[in-house]
């Protein structure tokens, strides 16, 4: 029933004229909690192994794809890690993204942390001057062919150009720099 509510929401977006949706599977919200072994203590088919923990997200994605067709863009925002002890690891995050990319996902936006443990409050990456998830994005881009969006800590045009020119990411997600 809950999966169908996500599918219906995406259908409403399409009917309203949007060309795509992004499934928010990051930051400790519901889908992120299913993915994280720290939060997901279920003993049914939605808990335990990574395959089981990603089942909810896969069912949402596949339901949307079936309902909306191949021409409707569907992406996800997902944590590289949730920075919790016994939480979602980079390895599990990579496996989840690869699985979804193989199912036809259109793009992935990389983020990290939860509102309990916000990654974007921490130190910035020295190798890219400001960006929080650049190293993870580089690893990911070697494993998938769909576009990758990096967000978090990107504050300057120089950093943006570096990320794009060295093939760290395909797109840059910015919010705070546009509002401050």
At which residue positions do the language-model features occur?
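Flavin-dependent oxidoreductase catalytic cores
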Residues: 1-180
């Amino acid at each position: 029933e809950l999966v169908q509510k996500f599918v219906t929401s995406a259908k409403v977006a399409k009917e309203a004229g949007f060309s795509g949706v992004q499934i928010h599977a990051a930051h400790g919200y519901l889908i992120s909690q299913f993915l994280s072994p720290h939060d997901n203590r279920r003993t049914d088919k939605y808990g335990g192994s990574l395959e089981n923990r990603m089942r909810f997200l896969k069912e949402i994605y596949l339901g949307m794809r079936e309902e909306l067709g191949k021409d409707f863009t569907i992406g996800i925002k997902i944590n590289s890690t949730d920075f919790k002890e016994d939480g979602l690891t980079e390895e599990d995050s990579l496996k989840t993204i690869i699985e979804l990319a193989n199912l036809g996902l259109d793009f992935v936006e990389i983020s990290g942390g939860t509102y309990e443990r916000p990654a974007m409050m921490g130190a910035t990456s020295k190798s890219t001057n400001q960006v929080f998830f650049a190293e993870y994005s580089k690893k990911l881009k070697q494993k998938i062919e769909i576009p990758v969006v990096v967000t978090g800590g990107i504050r300057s045009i120089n950093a943006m150009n570096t990320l794009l020119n060295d093939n760290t990411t395909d797109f840059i997600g910015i919010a705070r720099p546009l509002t401050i």
